[in-house]
A protein has these predicted regions:
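Nucleotide-activated sugar donor-binding and catalytic core shared by glycosyltransferases
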Residues: 1-240, 245-381
Length: 381
């Protein structure tokens, strides 16, 4: 019997962190030929992740251009995917999450009548402009997909409410699998400034901020809040790997650069980021992935957004929404800095995103779907 040709498609750093462990798990199965197609929606940041996981793509669309728009990303992905699908002839295409690459990859698969598996399916805010464009991307992919790999039961229930009743699996989140590869106790950073940080002596706060819906006034508020936190709390050090987006960098330069106890560094490879997270005191972010990663490492997360598509993290107590108003951000951050009981409650809450076996479950479910296994994997409880 011929091997199943399963092609994983991704283009951004967060997608790569979550998909690389799955690419490797699929490659370990004798029934599967694991193929990898990258769009390079984020070229430099993507390549650093591929290097960490030692993955060499079978196809590289290399679409990134300076100040690219959502329309150009999507159209280039669609055109490039035509050639990739014709050449590699996959039996199924796996897309992840909610990026423009995700949407274009699923749509291209549909045009070629190739089955689609959606990894990290079922996340919703029910506001099509927040996060933008991610909420609409994932809803559109849900209309196309054949298999839905949901991180949590809550995600599965979201899809059931939309009358999607077949091909639903609860797997946990593949990012927990990634952490098992990257986090090491005696890790030494290649970024020397990180080796010199006073871990244990001061409270290291890891910061990220990059989302499109935060461009403009919200980002200004966030930067001013971070500055205020650093100025008012001598016991903290803020470490901010600054996204390559020109919009983000302009805001950082205007409102945050030069503040005391703030370390502005370039984006970090996945292993550096995960090991910094493992050593920090807490995380402040507008990222989706960090809401899943940090709790697995026992780190409280403040989310600098108006809403989150990860309500199970809020319900579990690992994450708190602090919004995008300067005073609110400062108040919630300073509570965790100064109130040990509040900090410990978040740090010891149970992470709802699984046990690090999501990739195994997904591979088993795919084999079952194609009749190469008698039973699907047992869903994550």
């Amino acid at each position: 019997m011929d091997k199943l040709r399963i092609m994983s498609v991704f283009g951004t750093r967060p997608e790569a962190i979550k998909m690389c462990p799955l690419v490797k798990e699929l490659a370990s199965r004798p029934e599967i030929e694991s193929l990898c197609c990258v769009t390079a929606q984020h070229r430099q940041m993507l390549d650093s992740v591929l290097e960490v996981f030692d993955i060499k793509p079978d196809w590289d669309l290399d679409i990134m251009t300076p100040r690219q728009t959502l329309s150009t990303i999507t159209s280039k992905c669609l055109t490039g995917m035509d050639e990739a699908i014709d050449s590699l002839k996959p039996d199924m295409i796996l897309v992840h999450g909610d990026t423009s690459t995700t949407f274009a990859g699923a749509l291209a698969a549909f045009y070629h009548q190739v089955k689609v598996g959606h990894v990290e399916a079922g996340l919703r805010t029910y506001d099509k402009y927040s996060p933008f464009p991610e909420e609409m991307n994932r809803k559109l992919v849900s209309s196309i997909a054949d298999l839905y790999f949901c991180p949590t039961v809550n995600n599965k229930n979201n899809l059931l409410k939309e009358n999607i009743t077949e091909g639903l699996f609860v797997t946990g989140n593949t990012v927990i699998d990634a952490l098992k590869t990257t986090v090491r106790e005696n890790y030494r950073f290649s970024t020397e400034e990180l080796n010199r940080l006073p871990y244990g002596e001061k409270k290291i706060i890891l910061v990220t901020c990059h989302r499109r819906e935060n461009y403009g006034e919200p980002m200004k508020n966030i930067m001013l809040a971070l500055r205020q936190i650093a100025e008012q709390n001598r016991e903290v050090e803020l470490v901010y790997p600054v996204h390559l987006s020109p919009v983000v960098r302009e805001a950082v330069d205007k409102y945050l650069r030069g503040a005391p106890r703030v370390h502005l560094i370039d984006p970090l490879p996945a292993d550096e980021m995960h090991n910094l997270m493992a050593r920090c005191y807490m995380v402040m972010t507008d990222s989706g992935g960090l809401q899943e990663e940090a709790p697995a490492l026992g780190k409280p997360v403040l989310v600098m957004r108006r809403e989150t598509e990860r309500p199970e993290a809020v319900e579990a107590g690992t994450v708190k929404l602090c919004g995008v108003v300067q005073d609110d951000i400062v108040t919630m951050a300073e509570r965790l800095i100064r109130d040990k009981a509040a900090y410990e409650k978040m740090a010891h809450a149970v992470n709802p995103y699984g046990d690090g076996a999501a990739c195994r479950r997904i591979a088993d479910d795919i084999l079952w779907y194609f009749g190469r296994r008698e039973q699907p994997a047992e869903d994550l409880a």
